[in-house]
């Protein structure tokens, strides 16, 4: 599968990849501190000027299974962290709320739309769903034996 990217996206990727290996590599969306492959925030309340940064911060703090980690009986053998599908759904909703708000500034709308496109169309990460082995709801605190099942990717509407 081939993905088309803009010149700006390619330039940003090129700059990131050309940094020396000793340096931390950050690909952070301009105007944010949380939207990217890491964060540059000083603390939890440190946000960039784009409203999408709140969505990214919340998404970064979601339940996840890191590469090489086993959790809920699921081993993540992939190169990238996978998140709970509920988190991806909340992230999708948060970004769309910003871009669909008629009173939102055009820069804010564009920022949210760019983050959405990158994550849901270009990156298109897998996610996982939690289930309970004893027929209780996975959201029920009494469920002590949750297990995870990978969903190939979050399907947006």
Curated annotation (Swiss-Prot):
It is found in: Secreted. Residues 134-139 form a propeptide. The active site is at residues 59, 88. The keyword Heme does not apply. Glycans are attached at residues 43, 101, 153. Expressed by the venom gland. SUPFAM superfamilies: Phospholipase A2, PLA2 (SSF48619). This is Phospholipase A2 phaiodactylipin. It comes from Anuroctonus phaiodactylus. The lineage of its organism: Eukaryota, Metazoa, Ecdysozoa, Arthropoda, Chelicerata.
């Amino acid at each position: 599968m081939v993905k088309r990217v803009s010149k700006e996206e390619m330039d940003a990727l090129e700059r990131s990849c050309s940094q020396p290996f000793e340096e931390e590599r950050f690909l952070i969306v301009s105007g944010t501190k949380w939207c990217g492959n890491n964060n540059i925030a000083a603390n939890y309340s440190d946000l960039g000027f784009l409203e999408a940064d709140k969505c990214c911060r919340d998404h970064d703090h979601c339940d996840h299974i890191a590469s090489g980690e086993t959790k809920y009986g699921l081993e993540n053998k992939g190169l990238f962290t996978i998140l709970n599908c509920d988190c991806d759904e909340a992230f999708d909703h948060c970004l769309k709320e910003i871009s669909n708000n008629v009173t939102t500034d055009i820069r804010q709308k564009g920022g949210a739309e760019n983050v959405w496109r990158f994550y849901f169309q270009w990156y298109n990460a897998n996610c996982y769903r939690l289930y309970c082995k004893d027929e209780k709801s996975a959201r029920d605190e009494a469920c002590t034996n949750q297990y995870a099942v990978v969903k190939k990717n979050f399907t947006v509407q």
